Design a protein with these regions (language model features):
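C-terminal regulatory/interaction module of P-loop NTP-utilizing enzymes
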Residues: 1-175
Length: 175
């Protein structure tokens, strides 16, 4: 990674008006609008992962799953695809939102699992296989967490963000 210099601090533009609570709440989705065919593959993924975690005395609870589903329900690209009745975009957006939640909610629960022996073969290897089979972009980060944690799983990278959407980076650089 090449670090960029900032030679001059530029003043911020005019202060934007505060977002009203009413407007914010109008954006908030209070119910999951996914049908079973849409959400069950993700729920099944977490349940299968939970089976692997049980081999090392770990588990993901109902609240973890519920927070994942509601994060996905409120993800802007998911909401947009639902508004436009665009099934292809919905599937893609759901996968991106779910992958965010794997990193934010699930991977921290794996911290400290031993990366060798039975813990690796009974749990981490099975989880890795799930990630590979469903073509998630966090595999490199998962491998790094297994490799560089001094014998323990320690998630410490976000390389998947570089791969997931280069158009965002292009937009950001244009600013």
């Amino acid at each position: 990674t090449t670090l960029e210099r900032r030679r001059q601090l530029k003043p911020l533009g005019d202060k934007a008006p505060l977002l009203s609570r009413r407007l914010w709440e109008s954006w908030w989705c209070r119910e999951s609008k996914f049908n079973d065919d849409q959400i069950l593959p993700f729920k099944g993924f977490i349940e299968d992962m939970n089976t692997s975690l049980s081999k090392v005395g770990r588990a993901l609870g109902h609240r973890v799953w519920q927070s994942i589903e509601y994060y996905m329900s409120n993800y802007p690209d998911v909401l947009e695809a639902q508004r436009n009745n665009d099934d292809a975009s919905l599937v893609k957006a759901m996968k991106v939102a779910f992958e965010d939640q794997l990193v934010q909610k699930v991977m921290p629960k794996l911290r400290g699992i031993e990366t060798r022996g039975k813990s690796k073969s009974d749990s981490l290897d099975k989880i890795r296989t799930q990630l590979v089979n469903d073509d998630y972009t966090i595999i490199e980060d998962f491998d790094l967490a297994c490799e560089f944690g001094y014998g323990q799983f320690i998630w410490n990278s976000a390389n998947y963000l570089n791969e997931s959407d280069s158009s965002v980076e292009t937009e950001f650089r244009a600013l």
